[in-house]
Amino acid sequence: MMTVRIYKEVEFDASHRLLHYVGKCHNLHGHRWKVEVWIEGGPDPVNCIVLDYARIKQVVQRFDHQIVLNEADPMVAAIEAFHPVITTEGDPTSELLAKIIADDLDAECRSAGVAARVTSIRVWESPNACAELVR
């Protein structure tokens, strides 16, 4: 079976804060996030696609224009009265978002019935700062 590595870049806007950080990132603030993802696997024998790029974008875009907070953050309850909040098990750093998105994309591969997985993902929170998860 042939193995192919595909790449997709997706951007989204979202706010977050780091509950356990001492410094300005403890305040609620927003970013123009960029996600770069590499997925490796065997293409579907019928359509020759590893995973549809639109499916990758859809998984990442669930964060677009959202507020992302640590599930232990006391701000969650106050903000949820006005706007939905995506919560994470820990502070929503670029490092943690890389793991969450990679896991979500791996689940999407399984859901699509393709033998593929994320091998590398970068989550950029600014033009000069990113976290890269390599598996």
Residue ranges and their predicted role:
Residues 1-135:
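Charge-rich, low-complexity N-terminal segments
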